[in-house]
């Protein structure tokens, strides 16, 4: 892995972002199960050194000021973690509200492992997203750290390199100070069982390119076509055919997102459309013919507006 134990322990922010594959087991390197378990509360705090921040799009000038809140992460933030095999499961996977005026953390399921030469240290990585407060844009990142027995933990390296936001795009990277607290997690069993049930309930997932082999005559290249969405603004895409999820991947500005199945996506107008449709179906079920009724017949004040 590009991020070596010594670099994580030193916690010095580089001048440019890492590649996303630095946050997961190195390709071609025989990784093993983590030498130590990790159960308890991870507390993250902003470090004393400047973090990396690079703006690509800022339509409304959110980052114009050097001290703008959008330039810093929420601090402190904590998440209770449960381990199931090599899976590292946050007890809370919904937005974590706090006092930060711009960002809320959303954590996904990560993993633990160990690589040759790590010695007593084990590695952990967690996908996360930063959700804009009172908005729906999501900025996707990954964090990683090493840990050892007796609660020892390195600074946490983090990086954000993609988003679902048209008006604000930025790379964020650096280190957070970390503390691991040995707290009891009464809901650990339930969290693990819920995660296992979620995995069991997922559709089979295959690369989008395999669609052409499974369904001759289909054209995978038509999905996520550059004529429809600019490639560098694409978060993910795919199609479901015969109960199989064909995924186009999760590209970022720093390489493929290493936890594609954990990518948190906003609903935007999908939620409003689904809500309205479900509401109308319920209304029609209770009052057959309701979908063909005119509102003006029940609200005379609407007559003047047709």
Spell out what each predicted region is.
Residues 13, 17-40, 46-52, 56, ...:
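Extracellular/lumenal ectodomains of secretory-pathway glycoproteins
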Residues 261-268, 302-305:
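Second-shell loop/turn segments in exported
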Residues 1-40, 286-306:
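Active-site helix/loop module of the DD-peptidase/beta-lactamase fold
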Residues 65, 69-220:
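Long, charge-dense tracts
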Residues 144-146, 216-259:
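A short, well-structured edge-of-sheet supersecondary motif
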Residues 241-243, 269, 299:
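Short, flexible loop/turn elements at secondary-structure junctions
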Residues 266-289:
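Active-site SXXK
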């Amino acid at each position: 892995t590009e991020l070596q134990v010594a670099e994580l322990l030193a916690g010095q922010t580089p001048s440019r972002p890492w590649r996303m594959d630095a946050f997961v087991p190195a390709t071609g390197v025989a990784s093993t199960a983590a030498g130590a378990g990790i159960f308890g509360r991870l507390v993250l705090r902003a470090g004393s050194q400047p973090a990396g921040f690079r703006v690509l799009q800022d339509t409304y000038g959110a980052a114009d000021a050097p001290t703008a809140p959008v330039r810093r992460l929420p601090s402190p933030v904590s998440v209770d973690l449960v381990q199931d095999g090599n899976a590292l499961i946050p007890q809370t996977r919904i937005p974590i509200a706090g006092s930060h005026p711009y960002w809320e953390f959303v954590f996904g399921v990560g993993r633990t492992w160990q690589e040759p030469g790590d010695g007593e240290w084990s590695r952990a990585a967690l996908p996360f997203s930063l959700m804009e407060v009172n908005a729906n844009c999501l900025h996707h990142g990954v964090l990683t750290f090493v840990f050892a027995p007796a609660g020892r933990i390195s600074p946490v390296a983090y990086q954000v390199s993609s988003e679902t936001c048209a008006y604000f795009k930025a790379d964020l990277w650096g280190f957070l100070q970390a503390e691991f607290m040995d707290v009891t997690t009464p809901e650990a069993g339930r969290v693990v069982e819920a995660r296992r049930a979620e995995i069991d309930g997922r559709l089979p997932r295959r690369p989008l390119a395999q669609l052409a082999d499974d369904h001759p005559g289909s054209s995978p290249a038509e999905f996520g076509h550059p004529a429809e969405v600019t490639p560098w603004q694409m978060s993910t895409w795919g199609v479901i055919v015969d109960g199989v999820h064909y995924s186009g991947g999760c590209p970022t500005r720093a390489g493929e997102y290493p936890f594609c199945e954990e990518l948190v996506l906003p609903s935007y107008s999908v939620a409003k459309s689904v809500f309205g449709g479900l509401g109308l179906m319920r209304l029609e079920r209770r009052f057959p013919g309701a979908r063909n009724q005119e509102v003006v017949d029940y609200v005379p004040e609407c007559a003047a507006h047709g």
